[in-house]
Amino acid sequence: MRKFETLLLLSPELSPDAREALLVKLVSIIEKNKGQFTVNHWGMRDLAYPVQKHMRGYYVLLEYTTYPNIIEELERIIRITNGIFKFMTIKLEEHIEEKQLEEVV
């Protein structure tokens, strides 16, 4: 299993219940494949430019461990789900040392 992060930009028009239902749908894919996850709600933020004619969006960060082949299915579901404006998934390093972080900064 590997560690991943997916940042989601959701429509500001989604109700809190609709947001939770959407996240439950995504998290169930991870859980079904024996992955572990955390969900961080960053909340409503102003956007630097309009996205689908909206100047605000709701950000959610999913941090999880799963098998790499599950990412394809997760991203497929994200692409066809209404209410998700944008997303980005990245693979995290297994062990990041402080020295490596200093080199990046």
Curated annotation (Swiss-Prot):
Where is the chain membrane-spanning?
Answer: none
Query: Does rRNA-binding appear among the keywords?
Result: yes
GO BP terms: translation
Indicate yes or no for the key word RNA-binding. yes
Q: Cite a single GO MF annotation.
A: small ribosomal subunit rRNA binding
Which InterPro entries does the protein's record reference?
Answer: Ribosomal_bS6 (IPR000529), Ribosomal_bS6_sf (IPR035980), Ribosomal_S6_plastid/chlpt (IPR020814), Transl_elong_EF1B/ribsomal_bS6 (IPR014717)
Q: What does this protein do?
A: Binds together with bS18 to 16S ribosomal RNA.
Per the similarity annotation, which family is this?
Belongs to the bacterial ribosomal protein bS6 family.
Q: What name appears for this protein in its UniProt entry?
A: Small ribosomal subunit protein bS6
Q: Which organism is it from?
A: Lawsonia intracellularis (strain PHE/MN1-00)
Taxon lineage: Bacteria, Pseudomonadati, Thermodesulfobacteriota, Desulfovibrionia, Desulfovibrionales
What gene does the UniProt entry assign to this protein? Answer: rpsF
